[in-house]
């Protein structure tokens, strides 16, 4: 249901419902950037500069059971790719949107899913974005 997390009658997501789902599924969320600068006043990654990336190594350290990472959006995926390449035992490639790559990094096997951006600036219908997420959450 593409509208599952949308507030009824509104054009926004239901934060409480998302948190409830995340808790039940054992999901954690983080940004790939700790500090950013928007070069223009819009949601486009093209005008987003990462000033301080988040440390994936530090984020994963207290979560030894974490073996799946998901990125949404181009900038987040580019930043994660750079960190994975630095900490991987073999070359890492960018997954196709809606797909995953398996790799060894940070002393564990990881599955990295790259999903379509959830931003309204990304020109893909919510229904098509939901189709990609069905593969991640069968």
Predicted regions and their residues:
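Short, surface-exposed acidic-centric catalytic microdomains
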Residues: 1-48
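Short charge-dense sequence patches
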Residues: 2-12, 77-88
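Short, glycine/serine-rich, charged loops/turns that create anion-binding
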Residues: 34, 76, 119
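C-terminal capping/extension of enzyme domains
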Residues: 40-57, 82-138
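A generic secondary-structure signal
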Residues: 58-62
């Amino acid at each position: 249901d593409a509208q599952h997390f949308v507030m009824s009658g509104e054009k926004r997501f239901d934060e409480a419902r998302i948190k409830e789902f995340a808790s039940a599924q054992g999901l954690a969320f983080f940004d790939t950037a700790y500090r950013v600068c928007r070069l223009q006043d819009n949601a486009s990654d093209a005008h987003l500069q990462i000033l301080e990336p988040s440390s994936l190594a530090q984020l994963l350290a207290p979560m030894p059971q974490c073996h799946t990472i998901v990125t949404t959006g181009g900038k987040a995926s580019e930043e994660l790719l750079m960190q994975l390449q630095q900490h991987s035992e073999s070359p890492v490639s960018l997954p196709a949107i809606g797909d995953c790559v398996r790799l060894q990094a940070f002393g564990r096997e990881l599955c990295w899913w790259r999903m379509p951006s959830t931003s309204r600036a990304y020109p893909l219908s919510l229904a098509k974005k939901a189709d990609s997420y069905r593969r991640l959450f069968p």
